[in-house]
Swiss-Prot record:
Post-translational modification as stated in the protein's UniProt record: Polyubiquitinated by UBR3.
Family named by the database record: Belongs to the TRAFAC class myosin-kinesin ATPase superfamily. Kinesin family.
Pfam families: Kinesin (PF00225)
Acidic residues compositional bias, start-end: 620-636
Domain of life the protein comes from: Eukaryota
Region Interaction with DLG5, residue ranges: 358-479
Protein name in the entry: Kinesin-like protein KIF7
GO molecular function annotations of the record: ATP binding; identical protein binding; microtubule binding; microtubule motor activity
Keyword DNA-binding (UniProt): no
Origin species: Mus musculus (Mouse)
Length: 1348
């Protein structure tokens, strides 16, 4: 049931449309057994709260309604009205945790599946699709994101903006305007989603009992659309120069809160109070507007800032849809009732919507500058193609032909200028092929060369980007100058021919480029369709099961950061997926075979999941290797085109192409009110009813889906950054070219400055020499002193000029180094772009891997689905058996209570049953003690094994050290033997040498004594060495101190472990004796137990079974409560994981945003550098020549004007002296003579060029000031009655001459600025005329006074 938007010409009455959306019960609510208190009837547009509270709305959306259906029903008509020029607003209202942010689509856009995207992404995708489909529509889209936190504004797109800088004002039409909010121009869906994520990361959120990430502020996401070039259907066509401006507000209100329920304290309490006060003000406005009895009374818009923002949306100039979000839980009955009451009142509000036409002149200068920089690319292409018609060149021969030729030249220049700007943008575009890029680059180089040639050849008005009006004025002036005009016409004709040739080349290059764009767009569209088809196939083949442990495989990205406000897929089976199979009521008294089968299913599922993970990882590695090899063979990955930039990677266009009446592709989670009871039955209902086997997505499939979404988001973000980097590279290339051109000019300028500096230095040296000569002589008179003073002034001026030239040279050298800096930055940016492209390629490979893994998962899930069906049949059979057993037990209980056998159980029998129950409990305790003793014995044995293993390790280490000590001892013994043998040998040698000393000659004795000393020294060293070795052997220090200490510690540790092992052995021996004794006793007790049980009657046996059945039920209930607490803890863990993931994503997005802001600043810097380089180039080279010619022409015109005014002054003086007796004939003669003299004066001016003479300047300054005062007084004096305008005899004859004079000369009474007069004084005196001035007629004076 959609909202029908009325579209009538002019203003129309548009009631506020109200849609009601009911979210499903949350897992936590299901866990605690909350019931639904709402009954929805979407076909009738009715909803019932409780039993008898009925409400009707335009649209009612149930729990199973998906996001696509919400968009089609609520926002699609508003988007159509938005494009027709109406303002539109959609705002979500409701309590906290009711799904407002999820419905609006502001929460975690990147981590949500495509079918779960909210209103804002879908509306923006549809808007850009409509813009792209209409080529003739010239649109400009701005977005802003504002937050209202504690009644203070905060710009989420420019967080640094102070709150006081954002003001709420009203324009002259009464519309509410926000001043100081940053508006960002966007060209595609990716940019909008990126800005939305950036603002969402900066938004105020906090944790309450209802929501871990609850919105603590109101947000307003505004989209402004400016349209030109067409008129909406059924609306009057506007006048020329108007544009269509419409705004779309997406308002996400913070939820109303009950402080006792949310548990807010401290800062959260203050936020809750502020939120409730603003919502109360909004409720008062809705009540005042919706109450028919209060029509015309005061509306309290100014009670809150949010009501002032929504002033146009509620009762003003807008079409508004209110989406009321409610919770079906019975615990939120009062909040749901309040929301329904407010929504019901809002249906009575009537708005007056009008089409917003605005004159172009009212646009702000910033928008004009943005439009001048260039419209979106596809619209520029359309305009250039439509203007590319060939217009025949007119022939030369008359003024009309000259004017037509000038107009044609202006059009060609405009065309070429547009082509130049378009090709510059096209060159910066990443998807341009190599051949087309070379053609575009050659064409741009040729245009820049022609521009410089024309600038140097024909003055400042010959550039390609000159204004058409200036060209026409220059052409019109040149057409009136005879031979010079003919030459100008020939030049313009050649320029027109050349420009047309360039235009044809440009159109050919443009067609090639557009063809390449079309081919690339088709290929990418096919890839997107394949991705969508695979995704749909995956969604259709995604079964699940109710096995335990599924939460452990869920990735953090599979949850949104706002867990309690979104209708999660499978939310009602969340608790069943988390609970173990033992918690299900159907298994409480099931047979042992059923438990075994459940374990088998779990083991089989886990084994298949492990097998699938290993297979997918192996296949992914193989595919990654193959794709890397293929990537090396490729030259360059395909670049993104304009279509992708505007429509994003995700398949928004296919989804947005659904008609409003078509059913949505995907429904939300189907939940019936009876499902909570089936999911978590009460203890009283145990054993009754049927437990449905719910389905969930497999962990591997959800992980794959999450990775796929993350890869797509990463690709989109990287694509935006790559495009911005490429644009910056283009700016750097243009800056480099401009810097090179400026370098050439500066090199020439440096040479000229050096020559001028040399000349100035020579003059300075000469002046200093003359100054020294004059100072060396004694001044004789005043002339020499004045000459000396003049020389000093000239020397000071020359020195200052030399200093200025040095500074100019330094500045020029700094500019020369700008090119090298640009080259370095360009190389760095190219490396960054290559790195981003590699990352993009890796993400694309991951996309293909995930797609392949999805295909394999489909096959696996089909097998699992078949297995689940088999288990369902088996489960149903077991449930039937269980139901029969339960009915038998219930019948027995009834029979026992009612005494159907005719006899009442006596007190003695009851006591006997109690005794038997106690006896059984004692026997059970004995068995449990035996089992605990066995477990303790096993634990002791395990501990002993650990101690033994530790002792073994220590013993091995000790053995190693002892072996090392043994080896050291053996080495020392060997050293002692070797030293002893050497000492014996030395003793023998000493004795021999002593004998030779006694028997030898005197010469040999000296040599022998030296040898004896050497042998004694060696003997002493060996003795010392033997003493050291003996001391080591006696002390036993065969190891290092660290090793000795380690050996000592090992001995102590081994001794402690031996003691521990001895203690454990004793304890184990004792426990074994006790267990053997208790085992024999237990076997005897079991025999006694069986014997006693065999003696029990059937009634006693059933009574015992009932007692123990009640005990089992009690234990099961306790286990159920523990499981609920455990599930709540698991939910909290999941929420914390989501929060961590969301913060990580926000951090990564902030990094990307910082990189984008840096790129934008660098781009702006490069544009400013280009502007400075252009200005510098204009002031050098051709710019100086052009300026010199302009100044010379201006000086010449001023000299002529000054001469005319001086002649008029003399004439008026003679007229005053003669009086008013002159006749008409004398007036005619004087007038003709005046015209002749003026022509002679012009010729005289041409013969005598201006030359600066210092002696003329002072006299001319006084004369001109006096002439101006006298002529101004005389010209503005009243005329006599006899001087009539009709008395002019030559009025008709001189009309043509007057027109010529008016077009070429300023009026007589015009007072020149002082700068212009100063120019004429500096360039020389007025030539004296060679004729005597004569009187002029009164008619001539009248014409001079009133030239028009």
């Amino acid at each position: 049931m959609g909202l029908e938007a009325q579209r009538l010409p002019g203003a129309e009455e548009a009631p506020v449309r109200v849609a009601l959306r009911v979210r499903p019960l949350l897992p936590k609510e299901l866990l605690h057994g909350h019931q639904s208190c709402l009954r929805v009837e979407p076909e009738r547009g009715r909803i019932t709260l409780g039993r008898d509270r009925h409400f009707g709305f335009h649209v009612v959306l149930g729990e199973d309604t998906g996001q696509e259906a919400v968009y089609q029903a609520c926002v699609q008509p508003l988007l159509e009205a938005f494009f027709e020029g109406f303002n539109a607003t959609v705002f979500a209202y409701g309590q906290t945790g009711s799904g407002k942010t999820y419905t609006m689509g502001e929460a975690s856009v990147a981590s949500l599946h495509e079918d779960e995207q909210g209103i804002i992404p879908r509306a923006m995708a549809e808007a850009f699709k409509l813009i792209d489909e209409n080529d003739l529509l010239d649109c400009l889209v701005h977005v802003s994101y504002l937050e209202l936190y504690k009644e203070e504004f905060r710009d989420l797109l420019e967080v640094g903006t102070a709150s006081r800088d954002i003001q709420l004002r009203e324009d002259d039409r009464g519309n509410v305007v926000l001043c100081g909010v940053k508006e960002v121009d966007v060209e595609g869906l990716d940019e909008v989603l990126s800005l939305l994520e950036m603002g969402n990361a900066a938004r105020h959120t906090g944790a309450t009992h209802f929501n871990r990430l609850s919105s603590r502020s109101h947000t307003v996401f505004t989209v402004t659309l400016e349209q030109r070039g067409r008129t909406p259907s059924r609306l009057p066509r506007p006048a020329a120069g108007h544009l269509l401006v419409s705004k779309f507000h997406f308002v996400d209100l913070a939820g109303s809160e009950r402080v006792l329920k949310t548990g807010s304290t401290g800062e959260r309490l203050k936020e809750s109070i502020q939120i409730n006060s603003t919502l109360l003000a909004l409720g008062n406005v809705i009540s005042a507007l919706g109450d028919p009895q209060r029509r015309g009374s005061h509306i309290p818009y100014r009670d809150s800032k949010i009501t002032r923002i929504l002033k146009d949306s509620l009762g003003g100039n807008a079409k508004t849809v209110m989406i009321a979000c409610v919770s079906p839980s019975s615990s939120d009955f009062d909040e749901t009732l309040n929301t329904l009451n407010y929504a019901s009142r809002a249906q009575n509000i009537r708005n007056r919507a009008t089409v917003n036409w605005h004159p172009e002149a009212e646009r702000v200068p910033e928008e004009q500058a943005a439009g001048a920089r260039g419209p979106p690319r596809h619209r520029s292409e359309t305009r250039i193609i439509h203007r590319g018609r060939r217009v025949p060149c007119p022939a030369v021969g008359s003024a009309a032909v000259a004017a037509g030729l000038g107009a044609e030249c202006a059009r060609c220049r405009a065309r070429t200028s547009a082509a130049y700007s378009l090709l510059r943008e096209l060159q910066a575009e990443p998807g341009l092929p190599g051949a087309a890029a070379r053609k575009v680059r050659d064409w741009l180089c040729a245009v820049e060369g022609e521009r410089s040639t024309l600038s140097s050849a024909s003055g400042p008005d010959s550039g390609i980007e000159s204004a058409p009006a200036e060209d026409q004025a220059a052409q019109g002036t040149s057409g009136r100058k005879g031979d010079e005009g003919t030459q100008q016409l020939l030049t313009l004709q050649s320029q027109v021919a050349r420009l047309e040739e360039e235009n044809r080349d440009f159109l050919a290059a443009l067609e090639d480029a557009m063809e390449q764009y079309k081919l690339q767009s088709d290929r990418l569209r096919e890839q997107q369709e394949e991705m969508v088809e695979l995704r749909l196939r995956l969604e259709l083949a995604q079964p699940g099961w109710g096995a335990p442990g599924l939460l452990q495989g869920l990735p953090p990205g599979s949850f949104v950061p706002r867990p309690h406000t979104a209708p999660l897929g499978g939310a009602h089976t969340h608790m069943l997926g988390m609970m173990p199979s033992t918690c299900l009521p159907g298994e409480e008294v099931s047979s042992e075979q059923q438990v075994v089968s459940g374990k088998e299913v779990k083991a089989e599922v886990l084994a298949q999941a492990d097998k699938l993970r290993s297979a997918s990882s192996t296949t992914s590695e193989e595919e990654g290797e193959e794709e890397e090899e293929e990537e090396e063979e490729e030259e360059e990955p395909p670049r993104r085109t304009l279509y992708l930039r505007r429509n994003g990677i995700s398949n928004w266009s296919q989804r947005a192409g659904l008609s409003p009446g078509s059913p949505p592709d995907r429904k939300g989670p189907e939940v019936c009110p009876e499902e909570p009871a089936a999911a978590i039955p009460a203890p009283q209902a145990v054993g009754s009813g049927k437990v449905p086997v719910q389905t969930r997505q497999a962990p591997a499939a959800m992980a794959s889906e999450w990775r796929l979404a993350q890869a797509q988001q990463k690709i989109r973000e990287l694509a935006i950054n790559i495009r911005m980097k490429e644009e910056l590279i283009g700016e750097l290339v243009r800056t480099g070219k401009a810097a090179q051109a400026l370098n050439r000019q500066h090199s020439q300028r440096i040479r000229e400055l050096e020559q001028e500096a040399e000349r100035v230095r020579a003059e300075l040296c000469e002046g200093q020499r003359q100054l020294r000569e004059l100072e060396g002589r004694e001044p004789q008179d005043a002339s020499e002193r004045s000459r000396l003073q003049e020389f000093r002034k000239r020397v000071a001026a020359a020195q200052s000029q030399v200093q200025v030239l040095k500074e100019k040279k330094q500045a020029t050298e700094r500019l020369v180094s700008l090119s090298a800096q640009s080259e370095t930055r360009l190389q760095e940016l190219e490396r960054n772009v290559q790195l981003m492209r590699r990352q993009q390629g890796q993400l694309q490979r991951r996309l293909r891997e995930e797609t392949e893994q999805k295909r394999r998962l489909e096959t696996e899930m089909n097998k699992r689905q078949h297995r689940v069906k088999e288990l369902e049949l088996k489960h149903e059979q077991q449930q039937k058996i269980l139901k029969i057993k339960t009915e038998e037990i219930a019948a027995f209980q009834r029979k026992r209570r009612s005494g159907s056998n005719g006899s009442v159980v006596s007190l003695e029998q009851q006591q006997k049953i109690e005794e038997q129950k106690k006896w059984l409990d004692q026997e059970m305790e004995k068995v449990l003690q035996q089992r605990r003793a066995l477990e303790e014995l096993g634990e002791e044995l395990r501990k002993r094994e650990v101690i033994l293993a530790k002792k073994e390790a220590l013993m091995q280490e000790k053995t190693g050290l002892e072996s090392k000590r043994l080896r050291s001892s053996q080495a020392l013994n060997e050293d002692i033997v070797r030293v002893s043998s050497r000492l014996e040998h030395l003793e023998k040698e000493l004795s021999e040498k002593s004998g030779q000393l006694r028997q030898g000659s005197a010469q040999n004795q000296q040599q022998i004594r030296g040898e004896i000393d050497t042998l004694r020294q060696e003997k002493d060293s060996l003795l010392k060495q033997r003493l050291e070795i003996d001391s080591k052997l006696r002390q036993g220090s065969l190891l290092s101190p660290e090793e000795e200490r380690t050996l000592f510690q090992l001995d102590e540790a081994i001794e402690a472990l031996d003691a521990a092992i001895e203690y454990k052995n004793e304890a184990i021996t004792c426990r074994q004796r006790v267990l053997r004794a208790s085992a024999s006793l237990l076997s005897q007790c079991e025999m006694n137990l069986m014997a006693k049980l065999s003696y029990l009657s059937s009634s006693e046996t059933r009574a015992l079974l009932c007692k123990y059945f009640d005990k089992v039920v009690t234990l099961r209930e306790e286990q159920h409560q523990q499981q609920i607490a455990f599930s709540e803890l698991e939910m909290q863990l999941e929420e914390q994981q989501r929060l961590v993931y969301w913060l990580e994503v926000a951090l990564e997005r902030q990094r990307l945003e910082m990189d984008r802001q840096l790129t934008l600043q660098q781009k702006e810097h490069e544009q400013n550098v280009q502007l400075l380089l252009q200005q510098g180039r204009d002031h050098l080279g051709e710019g100086l020549a052009d300026s010199k010619r302009q100044y010379e022409a201006r000086i010449h015109a001023l000299e002529k004007e000054l001469g005319r005014h001086m002649w008029i002054n003399q004439e008026l003086k003679q007229k005053l002296s003669a009086g008013s007796t002159a006749g008409q004939s004398q007036g005619c003669e004087r007038r003709s003579l005046c015209l002749e003299n003026r022509q002679c004066l012009g010729n005289e001016d041409g013969l005598h060029p201006a030359a600066p003479e210092p002696l003329w300047q002072s006299s001319l300054l006084e004369g001109v000031s006096r002439v101006w005062d006298e002529s101004r007084d005389l010209v503005h004096a009243p005329l006599p009655l006899t001087w009539k305008r009709s008395s002019l005899c030559s009025e008709q004859g001189s009309s043509e001459e007057s027109r010529v004079r008016e077009t070429t000369e300023p009026p007589v009474g015009r007072v020149l600025p002082m700068g212009e007069v100063g120019l004429s004084w500096n360039f020389g005196p007025l030539p004296k005329p060679r004729w005597e001035p004569r009187r002029t007629s009164p008619g001539m004076i009248d014409v001079r006074k009133n030239p028009l």
